[in-house]
Amino acid sequence: YKISQRGQLMEPDEQHIRFIERIEPIVDKLLFIRGGNHDMIRSVNILGFDVSKVMADMIGVPYFRLPGYSIVRICDRKWKLVSGHGKSGAKNGDTELDKMAAVYSEGDVFFLGHNHQLYAKPLDSLRISMKEEKVHRRWYCRGGSFLKYADYARYRFYPIVRAGWVTIEFGEKEIKTWTN
């Protein structure tokens, strides 16, 4: 059984090999891999083969099929990163992040991909601690893309978005995020 590649330049196995080669320089910065819609729709549902799980094993990082929490420890500080692939193509990327934050309410950083939007923005709120009001900062991040303007995006009249990625730096006292 052959899955249509709809004009893609490489066969799936070649895509996988080339992707592993391309991320080799940053593998030491990857905390884990989470599954997403492409691997579920194509490799898992049709073939019973989880390409993201195999990729995680190849590069030696944990694999998580579903969205969820990850604890990032920096010295004595524990930060809660909530991440997932995402599934909505909505124009407002915050809507899906709002849903995620409602379910995973203890998060410090909320990170989703899927819709190719690229941003990292703070959300400030007030918290009471020892009779003192303090600003509590959380982050909303959409992970970006490396595609220019794919045929499927043209077909659906999706907006053209800039290519790039988000960097998240967890520190002892604060979290910094920026787009590249």
Where are these regions (language model features)?
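Core catalytic region of metal-dependent phosphoesterases/phosphodiesterases
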Residues: 1-64
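A generic local structural motif
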Residues: 21, 69, 95-99
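Generic structural signal for beta-strand residues in well-ordered domains
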Residues: 24, 63, 74-76, 103, ...
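An acidic, phosphate/nucleotide-engaging active-site surface
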Residues: 43-94
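Conserved beta-sheet core of the metallophosphoesterase superfamily
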Residues: 80-81, 87-177
